[in-house]
């Protein structure tokens, strides 16, 4: 019933879109007769019509799409089909276009990018990795430039490249930018650490199209982008605590709920810890560092699995995205968890650094005036797209009917029986000449099967999502006759597999999937590797009671039923009841996995709300400071008065020595100690006296400046220093607070409420501290000039 309703709703959406397609087709017939020069001139004409208010982007869409369509044919030799026009309209409307593999998403995106670039505010195509961004940019750049727009890659594709002054600003001044979600996110954070207006480079984020949108803003939504700062005071307990945790027994010393990523000590575990570490009360204030390290070690030992959550690669812990299987080099778990995993693996513990700036992809893309997305599997995430981003998903029809045959799951009792049968089936397929793509959940499994096939004298390509460019080339060749490819779920994603000569007659590409993934969207993506653009093909998933999905998420006892293992394997495999039961277990386990994923993203979104609001307020304040261009004429007495009133109200008793000490520490190093005229019992009199000292020091500082220009720079720098130092402490504190709250095992709603309450309290403290440091910095900072005559500011 629900499926029928979804189809009906989608058809209604398509009906209104097809009316616009008709208008585009009418304009397409018109512009075919235009000369190249006339067609090129349309871009300038469109810009003028938008600027003058004659047209909006919406009213201009049919004509602009027709121009971009015709230009695509003349420049690229590709003419967007009607289904691509439908996708392009969905993208301009700010929604999610579900387009199947091979339907031409790259070309589809050019039309809304062109249209929105006409506003002069910039547009972005955001994808998952550097290779895809560069590939698509290089392919489409000639089209944009022929039409009179500027286009750029959002980064310089050189490892550890150091950008020159103004280079990033030049990049972001282009009309159309191809980049990655990670690059854009870090640029946003870096831009908001700029210490001058000239150092900022990122414009207002206007319009963006996200390729593989479900992967980026759903699956990766919880992964924060982090810029690290100074090292934290490092604990030396990681290895010691790891040895203690190794002695603990589940359900005796600790309890865990793997599905919820929860683990905690039981009473016997607490007693064991107190005995092992000779501590009277494990939960006393003195032992809190020890408790934190025990919690980290427990999570590292039992909730994070090698080759599932992370690889040990070249002596480092490299995280893995559990949903996509993609490696996340350079990404570290926060709050000491990364170091606990290093200790678990017997490695040297790396330095845990404080957090300077952070943002999640959820909040990054909410900064756009409008954004849309493309994916082959959007419908399965529609409710989440709508709840989190107010986006609807429109299923775009395929140009040709899908011919791929998705075979029923093949069911086995154990993973060993499954592997034997699967290898047998693959060998049979290979002997016919059909290309085979075997997809595994982990790199470890992929390496195992690749080795097995080589031992059977079957050459194969192994792809485990490590070298994106090389693997894109290898996956592109996976459709050739007789080819055998073994890959993880993310390897080569974004690259079409085209069938070689003679393969169509053999039945097309055979996709064999070693087990169901934790998310049904990923299953669909993997099946979609075969059968592009109406090609023949097939897909089949092999399942067993030993599969990770069942072991991790199933609440059924069937997998542990020893009677099953006493039955004859052939009899069991022919039992429809057994097959049906196992399929039910797998489907339920996958549903639980997906539900937990949704809940985890909802939780992450809840936690992010506080820091998101605070970040916006702090960055707005930074920008106001950067816009100061008349510091000489600014009156800072209101700021100073607030700070001095805080001081007198915080002191229980005001004495001469305390006031003199305060002046030395915050206002002037040269104070002459003359406070004879001050009535220390009158707080307002003390505030007035401090204001007088403040004004004297400000006047002295201004006198020491060479010009109003340098005084302006001085004020900007000292205020930014105050904001940044306090914000750095606040961000790091919130990261630690979130980690501590996440370790609580019950009362989740109360824990989140408590987090927001403490976060608000700490923000108010930070705001007061910023004001205090501003006053201290503007009074006690000094400016000198280097050999080149450039100002150097020395902070107190």
UniProtKB/Swiss-Prot annotation:
Subcellular location per the Swiss-Prot or TrEMBL entry: Cell membrane; Cytoplasm
Main location: membrane
GO biological process: intracellular protein transmembrane transport; protein import; protein targeting; protein transport by the Sec complex
Cross-referenced Gene3D superfamilies: Helical scaffold and wing domains of SecA (1.10.3060.10), P-loop containing nucleotide triphosphate hydrolases (3.40.50.300), SecA, preprotein cross-linking domain (3.90.1440.10)
Superkingdom of origin: Bacteria
Entry keywords, A to Z: ATP-binding, Cell membrane, Cytoplasm, Membrane, Nucleotide-binding, Protein transport, Translocase, Translocation, Transport
Top-level enzyme category: translocase
Binding site residues for ATP: 84, 102-106, 496
EC assignment: 7.4.2.8
GO cellular component, one term: cytosol
Catalysed reactions, as listed in the record: ATP + H2O + cellular proteinSide 1 = ADP + phosphate + cellular proteinSide 2
Membrane topology: Peripheral membrane protein
Any one Pfam family match given in the protein's UniProt record, by short name: SecA_DEAD
Molecular function terms, GO-annotated: ATP binding; protein-exporting ATPase activity
Sequence similarity: Belongs to the SecA family.
NCBIfam families: PRK09200.1 (NF006630), secA2 (TIGR03714)
Entry function: Part of the Sec protein translocase complex. Interacts with the SecYEG preprotein conducting channel. Has a central role in coupling the hydrolysis of ATP to the transfer of proteins into and across the cell membrane, serving as an ATP-driven molecular motor driving the stepwise translocation of polypeptide chains across the membrane.
Subunit organization: Monomer and homodimer. Part of the essential Sec protein translocation apparatus which comprises SecA, SecYEG and auxiliary proteins SecDF. Other proteins may also be involved.
Name of protein: Protein translocase subunit SecA 2
Organism field: Staphylococcus aureus (strain MRSA252)
Gene coding for it: secA2
């Amino acid at each position: 019933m629900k499926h029928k309703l979804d189809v009906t709703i989608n058809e209604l959406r398509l009906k209104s879109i097809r009316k616009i397609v008709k208008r585009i087709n009418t304009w397409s017939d018109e512009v075919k007769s235009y000369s190249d020069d006339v067609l090129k001139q349309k871009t300038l004409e469109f810009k003028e019509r938008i600027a003058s208010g004659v047209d909006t982007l919406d009213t201009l869409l049919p004509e602009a799409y027709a121009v971009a369509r015709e230009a695509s044919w003349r420049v690229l030799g590709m003419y967007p089909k009607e289904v691509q026009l439908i996708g392009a309209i969905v993208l301009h409307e700010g929604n999610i276009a579900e387009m199947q593999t091979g339907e031409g998403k790259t070309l589809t995106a050019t039309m809304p990018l062109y249209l929105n670039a006409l506003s002069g505010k910039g547009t972005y195509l955001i994808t998952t990795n550097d290779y895809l961004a560069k590939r698509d940019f290089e392919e489409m750049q000639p089209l944009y430039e022929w039409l009179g727009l500027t286009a750029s890659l959002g980064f310089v594709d050189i490892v550890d490249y150091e950008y020159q002054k103004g280079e990033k600003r030049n990049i972001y001044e282009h009309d159309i930018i191809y980049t990655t979600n990670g690059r854009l996110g870090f640029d946003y954070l870096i831009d908001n650490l700029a210490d001058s207006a000239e150092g900022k480079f990122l414009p207002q984020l206007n319009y963006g199209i996200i390729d593989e949108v479900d992967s980026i803003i759903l699956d990766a939504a919880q992964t924060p982008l982090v810029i690290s700062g100074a090292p934290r005071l490092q604990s030396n307990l990681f290895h010691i605590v790891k040895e203690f945790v190794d002695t603990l027994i589940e359900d005796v010393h600790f309890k865990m709920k793997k599905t919820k990523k929860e683990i905690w000590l039981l009473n016997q575990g607490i007693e064991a810890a107190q005995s092992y570490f000779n501590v009277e009360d494990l939960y006393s204030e003195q032992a809190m560092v020890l408790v934190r390290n025990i919690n980290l070690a427990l999570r590292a030992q039992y909730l994070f699995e090698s080759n599932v959550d992370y690889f040990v690669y070249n002596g480092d812990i490299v995280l893995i995205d559990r949903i996509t299987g993609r490696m996340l080099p350079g990404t570290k778990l926060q709050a000491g968890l990364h170091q606990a995993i290093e200790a678990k693996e017997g490695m040297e513990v790396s330095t845990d650094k404080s957090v300077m700036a952070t943002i999640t992809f959820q909040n990054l893309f909410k900064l756009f005036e409008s954004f849309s997305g493309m994916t082959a599997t959007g419908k399965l995430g529609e409710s989440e797209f709508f709840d989190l981003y107010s986006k609807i998903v429109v299923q775009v029809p395929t140009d040709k009917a899908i011919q791929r045959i998705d075979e029923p799951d093949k069911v086995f009792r154990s993973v060993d029986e499954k592997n034997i049968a699967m290898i047998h089936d693959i060998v049979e397929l290979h002997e016919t000449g059909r290309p085979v793509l075997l997809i595994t959940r982990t790199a470890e499994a992929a390496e195992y099967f690749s080795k097995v096939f080589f031992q059977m004298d079957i050459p194969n390509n192994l792809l485990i999502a490590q070298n994106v460019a090389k693997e894109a080339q290898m996956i592109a060749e996976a459709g050739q006759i007789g080819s055998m490819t073994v890959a993880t779920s993310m390897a080569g994603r974004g690259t079409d597999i085209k069938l070689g000569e003679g393969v169509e007659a053999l039945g097309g590409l055979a996709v064999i999937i070693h087990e169901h993934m934790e998310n049904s969207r990923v299953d669909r993506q993997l099946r979609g590797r075969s059968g592009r653009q109406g090609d023949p093909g097939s897909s089949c998933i092999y399942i067993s009671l030993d599969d990770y999905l069942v072991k991790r998420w199933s609440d059924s006892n069937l997998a542990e039923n020893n009677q099953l293992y006493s039955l004859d394997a052939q009899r069991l495999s022919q039992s429809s009841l057994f097959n049906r039961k196992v399929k039910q277990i797998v489907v339920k386990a996958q549903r639980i996995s997906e539900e937990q994923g949704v809940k985890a993203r909802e939780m992450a979104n809840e936690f992010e709300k506080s820091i998101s609001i605070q970040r916006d307020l702090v960055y707005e304040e930074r920008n106001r400071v950067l816009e100061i261009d008349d510091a000489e004429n600014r009156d800072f007495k209101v700021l100073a008065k607030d700070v001095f009133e805080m001081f007198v109200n915080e002191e229980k008793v005001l004495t001469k020595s305390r006031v003199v000490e305060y002046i030395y520490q915050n206002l002037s190093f040269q104070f002459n100690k003359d406070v004879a005229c001050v009535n220390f019992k009158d707080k307002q009199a003390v505030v007035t006296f401090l204001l007088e000292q403040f004004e004297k020091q400000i006047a002295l500082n201004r006198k020491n400046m060479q010009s109003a220009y340098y005084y302006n720079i001085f004020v900007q720098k000292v205020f930014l220093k105050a904001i940044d130092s306090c914000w750095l402490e606040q961000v790091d504190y919130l990261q630690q607070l979130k980690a501590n709250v996440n370790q609580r095992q019950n009362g989740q709603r109360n824990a989140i409420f408590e987090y927001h309450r403490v976060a608000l309290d700490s923000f108010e403290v930070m705001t007061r501290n910023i004001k205090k440091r501003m006053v201290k910095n503007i009074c006690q900072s000094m400016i000198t000039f280097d050999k080149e005559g450039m100002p150097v500011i020395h902070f107190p």
